[in-house]
From Swiss-Prot:
Keywords: Cell cycle, Cell division, Coiled coil, Mitosis, Nucleus, Phosphoprotein, Ubl conjugation pathway. Residues 26-36 have a biased composition (Basic and acidic residues). Residues 7-38 form a coiled coil. This is Anaphase-promoting complex subunit CDC26. The keyword Cell cycle applies.
């Protein structure tokens, strides 16, 4: 394997300005999106997100990610299928 000297990266003023502009733009979009969502959740759903009830919080997370939990039954057919013993 050939050894080579590390590549030098230079941070220029233009790069910093571009980064700041992009960051401000993203923050403005995020704030605008939060404002729109805040107005749209007047049915009390926004308050449910702040509640301390762990079940409702868990349910909100499950709904958001699309997870639908299945109840597990503790019988032999669910564990081993339809095998004959």
């Amino acid at each position: 394997m050939l050894r080579r000297k590390p590549t030098r990266l230079e941070l220029k003023l233009d790069d910093i300005e571009e980064f700041e502009n992009i960051r401000k733009d993203l923050e403005a979009r995020k704030k605008q999106k939060e404002d729109v969502e805040g107005v749209g959740t007047s049915d009390g759903e926004g308050a449910a997100g702040l509640s301390s009830d762990p079940k409702s919080r868990e349910q909100m997370i499950n709904d958001r990610i699309g997870y639908k939990p299945q109840l597990k039954t503790n019988n032999r057919t669910s564990q081993f299928g339809n095998f004959e013993f």
